[in-house]
Design a protein with these regions (language model features):
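Metal-associated gating/positioning segment near the N- to mid-region
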Residues: 40, 45-115
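Core domains of carbohydrate- and sulfate-ester-processing enzymes
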Residues: 118-127
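Divalent metal-binding pocket/active-site signature
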Residues: 177-235
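Active-site environment of divalent metal-dependent phosphoester hydrolases
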Residues: 65-68, 92-95, 191-195, 223-229, ...
């Protein structure tokens, strides 16, 4: 006897086969048959006419790392049918941390300056796992990547320079250690600190190690806007040099100058795959990304970290003027400001939470470029934004292409309001 029989649902089996109306038989927690009509005894039978029957989803790009540690219910993902998440993305992971980094974490915790999420940091992946006890449940499966930015921050710091050879050797040791402790690959965050300072030699050395261990490399590319084609070329070249499986995270055309060129971007990816390179990608199912305003700053402004960037902006000198000119060129109009929606600042500047840069521009009586700088200063570069920087036509076209997966770029936040402090 079956445990559960689902009748008359629209079955999408996840193999790219055409959907069909039919039945799904489930026994011992597994799907045992899919067919247009199944006649069998079942402990429970449900008529699911008008509903879609599909396997649970794999979220190819997730940032649930610390949220999963804090609350294993994972309701925000589970209620959307997601059962597996690939985490540790964009170069960011809760580990590894150097001894000096962990000393600072403990000191901040003692002084009450550590947020709930910041508490989930550890020297190694193994030590991170110990922060969850055997009694702690888990609602989704997590596939953990180790972040290159996390490695580089502890080994090189936030300075703008190539890694020295001894630093590359230490980085490779930490990467190998993460693999041996159970990580499934490495993520690159080449648009964020400090990964944006990594040169090709450093990346090639680390990616080659991923190939040796048969591990995945996911990449937030150096540019996803005006220079997205050049950024993709860099990844294709690295795939050619290392033979590793490189997966492009949230492939997008995130600037007006490249809107409408989705087919050309995908064609570049396709030609590389036809060459025999193992290149894949995921995209958003929406025309917005999630990041901070500080990601719009030039790399020289971030040499030394976001604190350094804030000092440059506050000084109102030559560097401030150069950044302002850049913003005037890229975001001149009110509609550009309305594309930046600030979802939170972690309690640093509640007055901007839930508002667009366009709204703040009107409130403060400043043009949009000046408002962006003022927002960075008031929030100390601690703002999280949703940025509507894509053309819906491009997104829809990419979603229809073979070899393209879907990633949310989101976290498995619980529904408990107490878990959303600072929002």
């Amino acid at each position: 006897m079956l445990d559960l029989l689902l009748k008359n649902g629209l079955i999408c089996d996840g193999t790219a086969a055409s959907p069909f109306v039919g039945d799904a038989a489930i026994q011992n927690g597994r799907i045992v048959e899919l067919a247009p009509s199944i006649c069998a005894d079942s402990a429970e039978t449900l008529d699911v006419s008008g509903l879609v029957v599909a396997p649970a989803f794999i979220d190819m790009h997730s940032h649930s790392d610390a949220w999963f540690m804090a609350d294993g219910r994972c309701e925000a993902k589970l209620y959307q049918g997601v059962a597996t998440e690939i985490v540790g993305q964009c170069g960011s992971s809760c580990f590894p941390r150097s001894v000096s980094q962990m000393t600072k974490v403990r000191r901040a915790a003692e002084e009450g300056k550590l947020s709930k999420m910041e508490a989930y940091q550890a020297g190694t992946f193994e030590k991170l796992l110990r922060k969850r006890g055997p009694e702690d449940g888990m609602s989704t499966n997590l596939v953990q990547l180790v972040g290159h930015n996390a490695i580089r921050r502890g080994v090189v710091g936030l300075v703008k320079r190539p890694a020295w050879e001894d630093e590359i050797r230490l980085s490779k040791y930490l990467l190998q250690q993460a693999f041996e402790q159970g990580c499934w690959g490495m993520s690159l965050g080449l648009g964020y600190l400090p990964g944006l300072f990594a040169d090709t030699h450093e990346l090639e050395e680390l990616i080659r190690l991923c190939y040796i261990y048969d591990q995945l490399v996911t990449v937030h590319m150096r540019d996803e806007g005006d220079r997205v084609f050049e950024a993709l070329d860099e990844m294709i070249d690295l795939a050619r040099r290392t033979h590793a499986h490189i997966h492009i995270a949230h492939l997008k055309l995130g600037a007006k100058s490249v809107w409408g060129r989705a087919e050309a971007l995908y064609e570049k990816l396709l030609r590389a795959r036809e060459e025999g390179l193992e290149l894949t990608a995921d995209v958003y199912p929406y025309p917005a990304c999630s990041t901070g305003l500080s990601s719009r700053l030039p790399d020289w402004a971030l040499d030394g970290g976001t604190d350094h960037a804030c000092r440059l902006l506050a000084a109102r000198g030559r560097e401030h003027d150069e950044i302002l000119e850049l913003f005037r060129e890229k975001y001149p109009a009110r509609e550009d400001g309305d594309r930046f929606y600030i979802i939170g600042t972690g309690g640093v500047c509640p007055e901007v939470d839930g508002k667009t840069v366009g709204q703040l521009s009107e409130e403060w009586g400043l043009p949009v470029p000046e408002t962006m700088i003022e927002t960075l200063l008031r929030t100390r570069c601690q703002e999280d934004c949703i940025i509507f920087n894509m053309d819906e036509g491009d997104v829809e076209w990419l979603l229809r292409q073979p070899g393209i997966a879907i990633g949310s770029d989101a976290s498995c936040r619980p529904f408990d309001p107490a878990m959303s402090d600072g929002k």
